[in-house]
């Protein structure tokens, strides 16, 4: 799952919740066993809220628990505690968010959540609440997605299998203290929450829509309970079995989730006149987003005849002349070179010398890494076709039209009549965009303007518009692409990182020590590393390769090391970052995402959100040079032994990350300094024999070579010399288990 958690935040959430609960329980003379309610709240916050601040988790947990007791004497909760904590974190701190796709869409995940959720709900008599919510929401999504928009069933299945919505349905909306007591009213209320969730998610594109609707609707529950009588639920009067299921189910779900870690298209599709067969196997896109304003710059790697080029891109509004321009393709080279995966070098000091320790970083890592990794390589009128030409423009070397259509068959026929070769499968992909009231940006080359420009290549196209939807329509691009395709997204915001909301956004493995000889093959190494990471994540995740503050006036380090100069004002202007002006100090945050997608694994367009996450990240790999000799002192001999062990780990890392089997070259690398280890001082024999058998990988079969996947997952440090520390995957489960043991101890003590 590769869930990006922080142990400190998890600990703070649990301790704050339990601490506040115990304080109120003491002053209100409530049994200590009520702290299990705080434990459930902690699970909800940990599973659904994201923030890069431990303080936000503590504040959310404290207010979530405290608000329950404000209404204690009225014997009802005004808000679901976890929901209240989540909304407080988002609305008050501006440093928290919800990641709808963080739990993925795996069938096993849904099965786990469903199984344990039903165990809880069947005991607390709230199964109907979850079922009504799910049936209503899933039915509405089916009607809109499949029947109305005419997307294929894979798109629908992807939407409804998001783990976060199942967590919400089975563990949050079903809270018996914040749902109506009357069963029929409760069912209508649950259906209303589902309708509101559907509306906000599909028409206002709000991430975490269910959380917002629940926050607004639970204050109505006391009024509904007053108007429509029903049996009041009371946790204290429930059976021990119910309480046992409630806590154990949530804890098992959390721990299972934590332990489950383990060629490109344009935004549109290329179309060609005559019978030219065009495939676009890579693309780069610049995304700039602030509020509802979006700027998209699309690279152009087309290499065919100019007369055969054309592109179709869905856009949400009719673009005006000033909303379209061409830019220099140099901007993509600048952003790629600056944010690409990189090498960093460290140098050991000879411990036999008394000089101060020297450990410095060089910035001469391969600046063209990303390139080496990514490079592969009877006439009717439009009215009769149901097509409207909303606007036409001449921009740069392109003739551009903005089209709207009533149905896909007519649009396809119109484009064919205009001389475009449309993929056979394009019609089924065009229909959903038409039903969504999207327009179509169509561009082809004006040969006269292109010839007069003096350039023998096509410039990137930049468009800008205002709309609530923040997405890239990749489905249209797959209409004429084969196999897997790569897209690099360079995103700029004022606030923080950009992440995908309908596919998981995961960090590429980084800060890993690899052998010195990896320098000469770094491009191939990173290609293999990405392929293995992509496969490990189920081939349906978006990978983060770089995230950093690049505000021109900011004095902090913008990378470590830098493989090129950071973007300057002219670069920001070219990329469409309109607020990065000479006289402005507004923040600019740069996110680089790498997407490898295919028809089978990415059935939906990419949906994005801007988060307040300002944590810096870069894909970097560490080369550590040995100290120069001689190594005649005891410390020098100990250093040589540790050097050999470290190099063995580096070779293992090279295999685990990139799949490079150890060979004679790696043997030589590991054992390079073994001859010097035989010259130890005689007194060193007191510590054992100084005879050393060189390690030989050739004596081990590939089948028996153990690959420590913890290195790949970032769960374990690979060297004591590494300047970065990784957490193991057991820290949070162990802590959660400790909290459970503490709660059960309190319960037993309270009974006595």
What are these model-predicted stretches?
Residues 288-351, 411-432, 437:
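Surface-exposed, glycine/proline- and aromatic-rich loop segments on solvent-exposed faces
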Residues 30-105:
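Membrane-interface helix-loop-helix junctions at boundaries between adjacent transmembrane segments
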Residues 268-278, 369, 422-724:
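Accessory, solvent-exposed terminal regions and/or long lumenal/extracellular loops of proteins
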Residues 1-7, 25-30:
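Short, hydrophobic transmembrane alpha-helix segments
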Residues 319, 323-395, 585:
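A cross-kingdom signal targeting lumenal/periplasmic-facing segments of multi-pass membrane
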Residues 141-248:
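C-terminal transmembrane helix-loop-helix hairpin of multi-pass membrane proteins
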Residues 740-752:
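C-terminal membrane-anchoring or membrane-association module
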Residues 104-105, 242, 718-736:
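Juxtamembrane/start-of-transmembrane alpha-helix segments at the extracytoplasmic/lumenal side
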């Amino acid at each position: 799952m590769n869930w990006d958690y922080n142990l400190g935040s998890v600990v703070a959430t649990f301790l704050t919740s339990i601490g506040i609960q115990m304080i109120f329980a003491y002053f209100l003379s409530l049994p200590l066993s009520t702290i299990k309610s705080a434990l459930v709240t902690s699970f909800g916050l940990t599973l659904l809220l994201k923030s890069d601040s431990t303080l936000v988790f503590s504040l959310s947990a404290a207010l979530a628990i405290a608000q329950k007791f404000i209404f204690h004497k009225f014997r009802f909760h005004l808000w679901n505690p976890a929901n209240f904590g989540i909304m407080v974190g988002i609305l008050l701190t501006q440093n928290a968010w919800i990641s709808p796709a963080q739990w993925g869409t795996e069938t096993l995940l849904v099965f786990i959540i469903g199984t344990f959720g039903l165990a809880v709900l069947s005991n607390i008599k709230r199964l109907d609440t979850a079922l009504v919510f799910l049936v209503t929401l899933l039915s509405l999504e089916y009607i809109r997605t499949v029947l109305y928009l005419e997307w294929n069933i894979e798109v629908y299945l992807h939407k409804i299998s998001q783990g976060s919505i199942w967590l919400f349905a089975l563990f949050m909306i079903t809270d018996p203290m914040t749902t109506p007591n009357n069963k029929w009213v409760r069912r209508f209320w649950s259906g209303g929450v589902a309708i509101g969730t559907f509306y906000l998610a599909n028409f206002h594109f709000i991430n975490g829509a269910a959380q917002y609707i629940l926050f607004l609707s639970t204050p109505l529950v006391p009024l509904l309970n007053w108007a429509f009588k029903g049996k009041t639920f009371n946790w204290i009067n429930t059976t021990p079995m119910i309480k046992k299921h409630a806590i154990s189910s949530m804890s098992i779900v959390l721990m299972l989730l934590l332990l489950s870690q383990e060629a490109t298209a344009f935004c549109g599709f290329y179309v060609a006149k005559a019978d030219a067969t065009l495939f676009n196997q890579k693309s780069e896109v610049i995304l700039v987003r602030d509020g509802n304003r979006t700027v998209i710059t699309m690279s152009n790697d087309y290499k065919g005849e100019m007369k055969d080029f054309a592109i179709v891109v869905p856009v949400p509004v009719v673009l005006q002349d000033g909303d379209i321009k061409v830019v220099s393709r140099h901007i993509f080279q600048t952003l790629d070179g600056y944010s690409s995966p990189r090498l960093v070098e460290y140098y050991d000091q000879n411990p036999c010398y008394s000089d101060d320790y020297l450990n410095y970083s060089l910035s001469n890592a391969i600046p063209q890494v990303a390139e080496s990794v990514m490079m592969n390589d009877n006439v009717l009128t439009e009215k009769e076709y149901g097509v409207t030409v909303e606007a036409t423009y001449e921009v740069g070397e392109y003739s551009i039209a903005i089209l709207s259509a009533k149905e896909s068959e007519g649009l396809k026929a119109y484009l064919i009549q205009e001389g475009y070769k449309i993929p056979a499968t394009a019609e089924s992909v065009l229909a959903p965009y038409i039903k969504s009231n999207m327009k179509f940006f169509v561009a082809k080359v004006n040969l006269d303007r292109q010839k007069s420009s003096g350039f023998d290549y096509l410039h990137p196209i930049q468009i800008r518009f205002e709309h609530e939807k923040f997405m890239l329509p990749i489905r249209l691009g797959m209409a004429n692409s084969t196999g897997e395709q790569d897209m690099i997204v360079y995103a700029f915001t004022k606030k923080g990182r950009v992440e995908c909301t309908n596919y998981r956004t995961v960090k590429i493995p980084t800060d890993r020590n690899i052998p010195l000889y990896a320098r000469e093959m770094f491009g191939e190494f990173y290609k293999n590393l990405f392929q293995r990471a992509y496969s490990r994540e189920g081939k349906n995740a978006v990978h983060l390769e770089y995230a950093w503050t690049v505000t021109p006036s900011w004095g902090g380090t913008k990378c470590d090391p830098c493989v090129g100069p950071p973007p300057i004002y002219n670069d920001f202007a070219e990329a469409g970052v309109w607020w990065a002006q000479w006289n402005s100090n507004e923040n600019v945050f740069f996110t680089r995402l790498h997407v490898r997608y295919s028809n089978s694994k990415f059935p939906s367009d990419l949906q994005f959100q801007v988060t307040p996450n300002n944590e810096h990240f870069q894909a970097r790999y560490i080369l550590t040079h040995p100290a120069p000799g001689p190594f005649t002192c005891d410390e020098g001999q100990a250093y040589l032994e540790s050097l050999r062990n470290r190099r063995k780990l580096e070779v293992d890392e090279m295999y685990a990350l990139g799949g490079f089997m150890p060979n004679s070259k790696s043997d030589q690398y590991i054992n390079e300094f073994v001859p010097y280890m035989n010259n130890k001082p005689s007194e060193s024999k007191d510590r054992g024999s100084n005879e050393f058998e060189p390690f030989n990988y050739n004596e081990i079969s590939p089948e028996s070579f153990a690959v420590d996947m913890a290195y790949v997952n970032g769960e374990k440090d690979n060297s004591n010399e590494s300047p970065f520390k990784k957490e193991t995957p057991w820290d949070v489960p162990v802590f959660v288990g400790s909290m459970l043991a503490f709660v059960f101890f309190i319960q037993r003590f309270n009974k006595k």
